[in-house]
Amino acid sequence: MKWLKQLQSLHTKLVIVYVLLIIIGMQIIGLYFTNSLEKELLDNFKKNITQYAKQLDVNIEKVYKDKDKGSVNAQKDIQDLLNEYANRQEIGEIRFIDKDQIIMATTKQSNRGLINQKVNDGSVQKALSLGQTNDHMVLKDYGSGKERVWVYNIPVKVDKQTIGDIYIESKINDVYNQLNNINQIFIVGTAISLFITVILGFFIARTITKPITDMRNQTVEMSKGNYTQRVKIYGNDEIGELALAFNNLSKRVQEAQANTESEKRRLDSVITHMSDGILATDRRGRVRIANDMALKMLGLAKEDVIGYYMLGVLNLENEFSLEEIQENSDSFLLDINEEEGIIARVNFSTIVQETGFVTGYIAVLHDVTEQQQVERERREFVANVSHELRTPLTSMNSYIEALEEGAWQDKELAPSFLSVTREETERMIRLVNDLLQLSKMDNESDQITKEIIDFNMFINKIINRHEMAAKDTTFVREIPQQTIFAEIDPDKMTQVFDNVITNAMKYSRGEKRVEFHVKQNALYNRMTIRIKDNGIGIPINKVDKIFDRFYRVDKARTRKMGGTGLGLAISKEIVEAHNGRIWANSVEGQGTSIFITLPCEIIEDGDWDE
């Protein structure tokens, strides 16, 4: 009867009641946990797959915007993007299908033969036609028997137009396997817990302290920077709510940390890829941040800048102090790289806390080298125009004054003076006409009217005209027999060749000889015209300048021969407007060669027979 008494004891009843409560509670918790875990795992799984799809969507959209649609390069880039996800365990296969339902790329090696073939899939058609995502479950065999697969389709859009579909097969069966394993573990754990509870009832309090222990462990992990772990929730009591709140706190801290890191990376990316140079210092003026553009403009390595005094890096330590920079926010021009000739506009700003404490300085270097060059060229251009107009005007004024003073009555001097005045007037007219033409080209108002012509006939016609006019010059031609067609403005290109040929004849000496060589490159559909003279040549340090406006190698001789200094500059503008190039090679004392490259089409015999 002792055992019956023991059975009826409060201790036993408490143990029995506790065991019954444990059994009921574990069943409820188990069901809730299993359902919640299943939903969480499935949601997380689908969220991950959806995230992969969105990442691919953004990257594929970028590929289509950067490259010609349907090009080989675009297809290869898309394949490379898909390959980045090929080895992910949860991915069965990813395909990219264009708007015509043609498979452009796939991660599955065994299905590479399906590339460029049309696929008939209802979910793909739905995604392409409606422009909306869709998903469904299917059974599929990946070599280890049939398993559940979650298929997800997301349309890819460029400028609101659907250009394709990302088709993803994901191994969701692994999630169910994981749930089964967890259920088995849970069942085993329940049995062990019941066994231990019956024998060691006095350890019941441990069920209360366990969540607290978990939270303590999670706190330790958070202090180490690990925010991914979560406290297991055993119930809905105050401790469970505390665990849930703790998990939410951990999640928010993780999100805040991720946002901070994201903003830091974004800021680093912006600073790195800025077109302006950035130097950021601490409160003592030591450089702590220098982007690539700043290093490039300064012509210095990173180790020669970071940690050094900013004003010393900018060679301003003898001109300014940090206090002066703080008081004066005006920008100024600075020659920061004499070797490269880089001129920058430097703006300084001070980083100040709300309390007024200075924490650092920022220098923004804006490259104005090109602007300064343009301004310098503008001033030179105005000076050259003024000089070119002043010279003939001064000459004309002198002759007119002489005529007013009575020279008009001299039958020998008067005609000579009038002739010089007329020549100077004509030179000014030519100069003004050339300036007007250059102005039209600069403003793109000088229209280029292209037409397809027989270039062989075109160049021979120009040479024949000059050959008939210049009896004292020998013209040598080396022009291919094949017909070369070029799409050019005949009037404009005639002006170019007339200018080059006139210069060649003008500066040739002795037995004047002008050679013409035309070579074609069928591979690139380009031709090169070379016009060579046996003239006085050009010094090697001046060859590249002859296409500059108003540049003359010998100013006195050029004016004497009636040149304005704008002919080759106009020729360069015309050639470049034809997608061509013009340059010169010269040996002083031996002659000069002018090279002109232009697009062309070479017609072989029989090409017109088709």
UniProtKB/Swiss-Prot annotation:
One of its GO terms (biological process) is regulation of DNA-templated transcription. Its EC number is 2.7.13.3. GO terms for cellular component: plasma membrane. The chain crosses the membrane at residues 14-34, 185-205. SMART domains: HAMP, HATPase_c, HisKA, PAS. Keywords: ATP-binding, Cell membrane, Kinase, Membrane, Nucleotide-binding, Phosphoprotein, Transferase, Transmembrane, Transmembrane helix, Two-component regulatory system. It is an enzyme of class 2 (transferase). It catalyses: ATP + protein L-histidine = ADP + protein N-phospho-L-histidine. Residues 263-334 form the PAS domain. Member of the two-component regulatory system WalK/WalR that regulates genes involved in autolysis and cell wall metabolism. WalK functions as a sensor protein kinase which is autophosphorylated at a histidine residue and transfers its phosphate group to WalR. NCBIfam families: HK_WalK (NF033092), sensory_box (TIGR00229). This is Sensor protein kinase WalK. The gene is walK.
